[in-house]
Amino acid sequence: MTDTYLHETLVFDNKLSYIDNQRDTDGPAILLLPGWCHDHRVYKYLIQELDADFRVIVPNWRGHGLSPCEVPDFGYQEQVKDALEILDQLGVETFLPVSHSHGGWVLVELLEQAGPERAPRGIIMDWLMWAPKPDFAKSLTLLKDPERWREGTHGLFDVWLDGHDEKRVRHHLLEEMADYGYDCWGRSGRVIEDAYGRNGSPMQMMANLTKTRPIRHIFSQPTEPEYEKINSDFAEQHPWFSYAKLGGPTHFPAIDVPDRAAVHIREFATAIRQGQ
């Protein structure tokens, strides 16, 4: 169904595809931001949950989409510019950004640049909130290596599946994300590593927003109690931050528990409609 909503446009001399269901609703538009090395297909089940009630837009990043291709290097700053340009072309004013994984770097910078009137709230899904631990740092190093990047992806796939035979997620990993080669995976390792280096951690980046506003982290992984504790501690220190555990089996709640993710999106969208 989602591919019927697929469009193309020219953004800063780059031909980008994007999803827009063109639903005429009383705002905000829901802006779903993919992470690296996947595209609008990661959100196809979540779009089904939201389609009837919201305008839903999903930008595909440079080199991403149904026909991935090699492109000049870019990072999350360019992703922010591309997303805002697509919204401007579509005449979208108020929007609720929702990100998956390291699309979170885009979301926070998008909040900074768009300001609280245009983007009053944000939702991040399954984003590693602490500084990279050794295993993840090793994965980033492998992704950057043209000889070993596939080893890096296989290790990440195992972590993300967490021993579960979740058919929808396996299809996404092995059929959809498999479309992407070293150009994209290597770039993801470089950009993510650089983002942690620049910002310290996602929590530090959020805390450094010029104008903070409600942000909620909804996640299934990691499952360690200490991970929930850092979210809880951050929420206690920053009243604008909240979190919710979704209890899904994998790193992809938009695929395996889209109904649970949609509950939080509806809550935040309703608050925006009510001027909160």
Swiss-Prot record:
Keyword Cytoplasm: no
Impact after mutating residue 38 to A: Strongly reduced affinity for substrate. Reduced enzyme activity
Binding site for substrate: 36-38, 100-101, 160
InterPro entries hit by this protein: AB_hydrolase_1, AB_hydrolase_fold, AB_hydrolase_sf
Site (Increases basicity of active site His): 126
Key words of the record: Dioxygenase, Oxidoreductase, Plasmid
Superkingdom to which the source organism belongs: Bacteria
Gene Ontology biological process terms in this record: catabolic process
Induction: Expressed from a large linear plasmid that contains the operon for quinaldine degradation.
Pfam family, one: Abhydrolase_1
Mutagenesis / variant outcome for changing residue 102 to L: Strongly reduced enzyme activity
Active-site residues from the entry: 251 (proton donor/acceptor)
pH dependence: Optimum pH is 8-11.
Catalytic activity: 3-hydroxy-2-methyl-1H-quinolin-4-one + O2 = N-acetylanthranilate + CO + H(+)
Domain AB hydrolase-1 stretches: 28-150
EC number: 1.13.11.48
GO molecular function list: 3-hydroxy-2-methylquinolin-4-one 2,4-dioxygenase activity; oxidoreductase activity, acting on single donors with incorporation of molecular oxygen, incorporation of two atoms of oxygen
Record's cofactor remark: None. Contrary to most other dioxygenases, this enzyme does not require a cofactor for catalysis.
Function according to Swiss-Prot or TrEMBL: Ring-cleaving dioxygenase involved in quinaldine degradation and utilization.
Family label: Belongs to the AB hydrolase superfamily.
Stated name of the protein: 1H-3-hydroxy-4-oxoquinaldine 2,4-dioxygenase
Protein source organism: Paenarthrobacter nitroguajacolicus
Gene: hod
